[in-house]
Amino acid sequence: MSEPEFQQAYDEVVSSLEDSTLFEQHPKYRKVLPIVSVPERIIQFRVTWENDKGEQEVAQGYRVQYNSAKGPYKGGLRFHPSVNLSILKFLGFEQIFKNSLTGLDMGGGKGGLCVDLKGRSNNEIRRICYAFMRELSRHIGQDTDVPAGDIGVGGREIGYLFGAYRTYKNSWEGVLTGKGLNWGGSLIRPEATGYGLVYYTQAMIDYATNGKESFEGKRVTISGSGNVAQFAALKVIELGGTVVSLSDSKGCIISETGITSEQVADISSAKVNFKSLEQIVGEYSTFTENKVQYISGARPWTHVQKVDIALPCATQNEVSGDEAKALVAQGVKFVAEGSNMGSTPEAIAVFETARATASTLKESVWYGPPKAANLGGVAVSGLEMAQNSQRITWSSERVDQELKKIMVNCFNECIDSAKKYTKEGNALPSLVKGANIASFIKVSDAMFDQGDVF
């Protein structure tokens, strides 16, 4: 069976490991690869509901419970017409390693439903969520498998799914994360991936410049305009950077003087009503006061002028090899991914070559991979699980502080593994290899200790 997305994720991990001295120094780890690449369990189920016309509809539901050596399965639910087993296996496989880098007790999994929610009423979406959870509730629990949201599953859907679980199981427990604040959710959860991405990038800047530089005065190109992009943009602006772009599936906006926090707030409120950036730019007064250029059908990478930092926050394979070359030509020094697998293998090769072949640190381009750079969301999901188990709610300051600590610790682990197991000479260590090696060792050690590999 052809599984291109999963194969791409698997090949990326394997190439990092093969290209390091890990197997040479510790041959036993090679035995883990064929075991960890096979999910512990794949659940496929039929989901049927009545639509608003009174007709019955059916869709395929999935939960891939990939690996529980480090803790309960943890990973999002995606409701989207593109959902298939290859995509969920790719996301679940990545999730195992990403979750291990948080330092929290979480395994990896992913699930979803092959359905398009666009144009459906609130009532129908509630019926879909209840129908989906009717089957999924047999397979999850706070110590077994704790799903979260993903594409197509936001706060509203999590609410319906949680209500359905409570109804079917007669149990109020922290079985989902991303919950509402007044019924078990965590502060900073919506902001977590975007904030965490910026904290990770800040750690990259600190290391590369010996603490001499920060986001202050940096020009930052961001793609996407959803949660991750919005909160990354707001944090960059707060830290003194200039955000020169945002995008959606129909086009991008470019502002050489900088997109403002007021404009980001307008995008946030308009996106709830599924408005496109083109509509938002035409309708909101903040965009007349501070003009932006809207480019239809384009991604921002080749349209921005000089940039220091690129943060892809939209979707998979959104930066091509040619676009990566354009970013390098425009002076980009740091690239960190807010989206999963945002850069194609060709783009990653461009960034990694620019890093490895730079004659000085000033000429180098440093790439932060998604399994490390965007783990802020799942980190705060883990903190939500911790709060639920104690039936308490932490302050936003405490959650933000814990998030920052997790992102910096993750960066340091990536650096340490890259230095120990790769031969980079004077170049900046490869964070791609560092993240893959550090996370692989953590998961492998747990599997050896528990007899999953022997």
Swiss-Prot record:
Classification via Gene3D superfamilies: Glutamate Dehydrogenase, chain A, domain 3, Leucine Dehydrogenase, chain A, domain 1, NAD(P)-binding Rossmann-like Domain
Segments forming a coiled coil: none
GO cellular component terms listed in the entry, alphabetical order: cytosol
Keywords: NADP, Oxidoreductase
Enzyme Commission number(s) from the entry: 1.4.1.4
Catalysed conversion reaction: L-glutamate + NADP(+) + H2O = 2-oxoglutarate + NH4(+) + NADPH + H(+)
GO BP annotations listed: glutamate biosynthetic process
Binding site for NAD(+): 174-203
Molecular function (Gene Ontology), one example: glutamate dehydrogenase (NADP+) activity
Domain of life: Eukaryota
PROSITE patterns to which the protein is assigned, alphabetical: GLFV_DEHYDROGENASE (PS00074)
InterPro entries (UniProt xref): Aminoacid_DH-like_N_sf, Glu/Leu/Phe/Val/Trp_DH, Glu/Leu/Phe/Val/Trp_DH_C, Glu/Leu/Phe/Val/Trp_DH_dimer, Glu/Leu/Phe/Val_DH_AS, Glu_DH, Glu_Leu_Phe_Val_DH, NAD(P)-bd_dom_sf
Annotated family: Belongs to the Glu/Leu/Phe/Val dehydrogenases family.
Assembly: Homohexamer.
Protein name: NADP-specific glutamate dehydrogenase 1
Gene: GDH1
